[in-house]
């Protein structure tokens, strides 16, 4: 009888689901007369998310190269819990309300597998959301507490 153990899987080979990282792309279109005010609101929301959401690993606001009124929030979440926190974070709730006044389109795509409960909670927002569940692959995303994160940020 062998006492050998199976080799440990590398940490980036994690099962996909509620505890795995995922990508969210939110596309929004701004009313032309509201562009300056919208940009200020988006920047305030971005800074607040950075200060309050440890589970948000990547958060950028990107302008479409062909339409100066179309923007994309590119977001990477640590897990489902990070998204659920994001959805109830007061600065984000305020920004979503502001988008309702200053924007005229908002749609979301999620790349990665979320739990059924998370999808139900997120879909209850009424925003059009398309879910792309993971079939296979891996993630090397590190959390802020990892050694690599400190190296990337210039903090040994």
Task: Tell me the role of every PLM-derived stretch.
Residues 91-97:
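A short, acidic, amphipathic alpha-helical segment used as a generic capping/interface helix at domain edges
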Residues 2-71, 78-88, 101-156:
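Short S/T/G/P-rich N-terminal loop/turn motif that feeds into the first structured element of a domain
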Residues 1-2, 96:
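Short intrinsically disordered, low-complexity coil segments enriched in acidic
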């Amino acid at each position: 009888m062998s006492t050998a153990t199976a080799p440990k899987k590398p940490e980036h080979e994690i099962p996909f689901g509620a505890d795995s990282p995922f990508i969210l792309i939110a596309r929004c279109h701004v009313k032309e007369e509201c562009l300056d005010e919208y940009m200020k609101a988006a920047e305030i929301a971005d800074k607040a998310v950075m200060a309050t959401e440890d589970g948000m690993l990547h958060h950028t606001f990107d302008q479409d190269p062909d339409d100066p009124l179309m923007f994309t929030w590119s977001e990477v979440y640590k897990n489902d819990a990070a998204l659920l926190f994001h959805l109830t974070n007061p600065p984000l709730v305020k920004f979503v309300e502001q988008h309702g006044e200053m924007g005229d389109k908002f749609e979301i795509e999620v790349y990665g597998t979320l739990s059924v409960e998370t999808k139900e909670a997120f879909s209850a927002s009424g925003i059009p959301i398309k879910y792309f569940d993971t079939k296979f692959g891996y993630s090397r995303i590190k959390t802020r507490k990892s050694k690599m994160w400190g190296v990337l940020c210039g903090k040994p």
